Curated annotation (Swiss-Prot):
Gene from which the chain derives: yphD
Role summary: Probably part of the binding-protein-dependent transport system YphDEF. Probably responsible for the translocation of the substrate across the membrane.
One family name in Pfam for this protein: BPD_transp_2
Subcellular location: Cell inner membrane
Any GO CC annotation of this UniProt entry: ATP-binding cassette (ABC) transporter complex
Listed transmembrane segments: 28-48, 63-83, 84-104, 105-125, 131-151, 172-192, 222-242, 251-271, 278-298, 303-323
Species, as recorded: Escherichia coli (strain K12)
Membrane-topology descriptor: Multi-pass membrane protein
Protein name in the entry: Probable ABC transporter permease protein YphD
Annotated GO biological process: transmembrane transport
GO molecular function, one term: transmembrane transporter activity
Family per similarity comment: Belongs to the binding-protein-dependent transport system permease family. AraH/RbsC subfamily.
Major site of localization recorded for this protein: membrane
Keyword Protein biosynthesis recorded: no
């Protein structure tokens, strides 16, 4: 199980070799991020500018907020491919509620509840009816995408000017509000994963669900809760996306689920479950965001960008696997 931060443990004498071995994945990702900054700074006009760095933070928030819950889902040995359509559907529902003059606070509360309920539905299908999580969330992906496009005729639903939404889509002390929310939620999920019985149960279920059940862990409840959290954070992302775009859009967040899953896996979380790190996911989010931003500034064809991004992601995952295997051998 990877640690969630890099500082040396207090009260323990740890050699540099042991420290590097323990955090080889995070160190590797930091090196990758440094290389990306160097390459794009030299070749992509405007990449290092303050304005572009704020854009990087905004894009990172769109991926990162959903990635915190996805980390727990993958650690538990599950997967959720419904994130993108859920984010878009929430933004559409929020826009319609505001058009019907529902107060913003009530509208936000309703779409947060909607996101949690949709996540719970996926969790119940997995935890109660034992439907594979990929199948359950793939069905949800199709239903939400189709419903959103049907409700809007594939057109954006405009949102009238609103001071609170403008603030959510803007900056606070020069930093995007969405990025600040991402950081707060990151700290919360680090606490949940490391300091609570629920967090430890997630790792146990991912390591061996049968053994976890025999140890008294309610596997069904754990599975339902992690999908509920995923739906809730997807709703948060949907609200922030609507605030940023000034509209609800069923076509927004297209492919977001793949960026989120890629960020988690690149960050070192094992798809087989039982091992993962939120700090690694944070670095994975930065890697995926920097790649996307840099390729746009380089003027690479949008279709070819997907090819380049896919190759880089596969290489990063392979590097993560090799580094982890090398670390495991070193510990022996």
């Amino acid at each position: 199980m990877s640690a969630s931060s890099l500082p040396l443990p207090q009260g323990k004498s740890v050699s540099l070799k042991q420290f590097v071995s323990r955090h080889i994945n995070e160190i590797g990702l930091l090196v990758v991020i440094a290389i990306l900054y160097l390459v794009f700074s030299l070749n992509a006009p405007g990449f290092i500018s303050l304005n572009n760095q704020m854009n990087v933070l905004r894009d990172a928030a769109t991926i990162g907020i959903a990635a915190w819950a996805m980390t727990l889902i993958i650690i538990s040995g599950e997967i959720d491919v419904s994130v993108g359509p859920m984010v878009a559907f929430v933004s559409v529902c929020l826009a319609f509620l505001l058009q019907f003059e529902v107060p913003l606070a009530v509208a936000c509360l309703l779409v947060l509840l909607l996101g949690a309920l949709m996540g719970t539905l996926a969790g119940v299908l997995r935890g109660v009816f034992n439907v594979p999580s990929f199948v359950a969330t793939l069905g949800l992906w199709s239903a939400l995408r189709g419903m959103g496009l049907f409700m809007t005729n594939a057109l954006p639903v405009p949102i009238d000017e609103n001071e609170v939404l403008d603030w959510l889509g803007g900056q606070f002390l020069g930093v995007p509000v969405s990025a600040l929310i991402m950081i707060v939620l990151f700290a919360l999920f680090v606490f949940i994963s490391r300091k609570t019985a629920f967090g430890r149960s997630v790792f146990a279920v991912g390591g061996n669900a049968t053994a976890a059940q025999l140890c008294g862990i309610n596997v069904r409840r754990v599975r339902i809760l992690i999908f509920t959290l995923s739906g809730l954070l997807a709703a948060v992302t949907g609200i922030l996306l609507a605030a940023r775009l000034g509209s609800g859009n069923a076509g927004a967040a297209n492919g977001l689920e793949f960026d989120v899953i890629a960020a988690v896996v690149v960050g070192g979380t094992a798809l087989s479950g039982g091992r993962g790190s939120l700090f690694g996911t944070l670095l994975g989010v930065l890697v995926i965001t920097l790649i996307g931003n840099g390729l746009v500034l380089l003027g690479i064809n949008s279709f070819f960008q997907q090819v380049v991004r896919g190759v880089i992601i596969v290489v990063a995952v392979l590097a993560n696997i090799l580094l982890t295997q090398r670390s495991s051998k070193a510990k022996r």
